[in-house]
From Swiss-Prot:
GO molecular function, one term: RNA binding
Any Pfam family hit: NusB
Native species: Bacillus anthracis
UniProt xrefs under Gene3D superfamilies: NusB-like (1.10.940.10)
CDD domains: Terminator_NusB (cd00619)
Gene designation per UniProt: nusB
Segments passing through the bilayer: none
GO CC aspect terms: cytosol
Alphabetical UniProt keywords: RNA-binding, Transcription, Transcription antitermination, Transcription regulation
Name recorded for this polypeptide: Transcription antitermination protein NusB
HAMAP family per record: NusB
Family: Belongs to the NusB family.
Biological-process GO terms, alphabetical: DNA-templated transcription termination; transcription antitermination
Length: 130
């Protein structure tokens, strides 16, 4: 599984967890996989890592929102931000610009017209604080 695909699956897993409020991370990951597709370590680390660091990640996002509340952001955008912020804070081997570009590309696919710019702005602000 390519890293872009893993990031997309991680975003989808966090989306499911946000909607249901009770899905276990491994179940959410399994729900995103195509038939016969296997998970990988990168995908699982993104989802489990977010769950283990949810408060820190959400606070980093909150501190960089202007005139928005985290709870009012679309679930898709919130999920993309959460995956990207986890990656930026805890996966130091991945350059921040790569993470931001990947998040923007995922937003183009899954978000609305404004998602791409919104996500770029928030992540750029967070990058400056790390």
């Amino acid at each position: 599984m390519k890293r872009r695909t893993a990031r997309e699956r991680a975003m989808q897993a966090l989306y499911q967890m946000d909607i249901t409020g009770e899905l276990e991370p491994k179940v959410a990951v399994e729900n995103t996989l195509d038939e016969g597709e296997e998970t990988n370590e990168f995908l699982e680390s993104l989802v489990v890592g977010f769950v283990e660091n949810k408060e820190v990640i959400d606070e980093a996002i909150r501190q960089n929102l202007k005139k928005w509340k985290l709870e009012r952001i679309s679930i898709v955008d919130r999920s993309i931000l959460r995956v990207a912020v986890y990656e930026m804070k805890y996966m130091e081997e991945i350059p921040h610009n790569v993470t931001i570009n990947e998040a923007i590309e995922i937003a183009k696919t899954f978000g609305d017209e404004e998602s791409r710019r919104f996500i770029n702005g928030v992540l750029s602000n967070i990058k400056d604080t790390l």
